[in-house]
Regions:
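Acidic-leaning, charged glycine-interspersed low-complexity segments
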Residues: 30-41, 125-187
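Protruding loop/beta-arch "assembly-hinge" segments enriched in small, turn-prone residues
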Residues: 187-198
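Residue-level signal for well-ordered alpha-helical segments
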Residues: 89-93, 118, 122-124, 157-161
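Oligomerization/assembly interface segments of phage tail-like spikes and tubes
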Residues: 98-113, 173-188
Length: 198
């Protein structure tokens, strides 16, 4: 069975929405913690461009940039998920249909303390405050994926996924943040396109 045409995009939108809600929920309970970025929250194609990390679009908006992107799509199997399958397809026999694995990248950027206009480095207090925001963001994004991903599949046991490494990125260009990878199983549920054999 093949994937439905919107299988990937619908999942990326669901992950984006889930993480955004989690960031806003955390901001409501942790003093001084920013919520979901107001202006730059989107699914992006390919590698993430660091377009904005500090510019809110209004005085009441939250700055930053939250993105979800696809790193890769590949064949796997029920037994070996998330390992890449090396089974040859299209041969006769009773091989189970392959499972499709999708590696997603969730990236969250915030403003990083930088040098002052007089060339002085950021203070330890500024660095500590930025670290606190980053550390809370790291836990929030991780927990959001753990809690939301099972509910994105309408199966009895929920969606299968494997949390990948989370790493800090930056500071660079006034931005600092995190990148969280997660590999998700996409079960096929669409028929293969009709086509006559050559």
């Amino acid at each position: 069975m093949a994937l439905t045409p919107l299988a990937i995009h619908d999942l990326t939108e669901a992950v984006l929405g889930c993480v955004c809600v989690a960031l806003d929920t955390t901001a409501a309970t942790v003093d001084g913690q920013p919520g979901c970025p107001s202006c730059r929250t989107c699914v992006v194609p390919g590698a993430v461009a660091w377009d904005s990390c500090d510019d809110p679009c209004s005085d009441t908006a939250t700055g930053g940039q939250l993105t979800v992107s696809v790193a890769r799509l590949y064949a796997s199997s029920d037994v070996d998920f998330p390992a890449e399958s090396s089974s040859v397809q299209g041969v006769r026999g009773c091989l189970p249909p392959p499972m499709t694995a999708l590696e997603l990248v969730v990236t969250l950027l915030r403003c990083a303390p930088t040098f002052t206009e007089h060339g002085c480095p950021p203070s330890c207090e500024e660095l500590s405050a930025a670290s606190r925001v980053l550390h809370v963001d790291m836990v929030t994004v991780y927990n959001a994926l753990l809690c939301c991903l099972p509910g994105t599949e309408q199966r009895r046991r929920g969606r299968r996924f494997v949390m990948g490494a989370q790493r800090t990125i930056g500071p660079q260009g006034g931005c600092v943040g995190l990148e969280q990878r997660v590999t998700v199983a996409l079960p096929g549920c669409a028929p293969c396109p009709d086509r006559e054999s050559p």
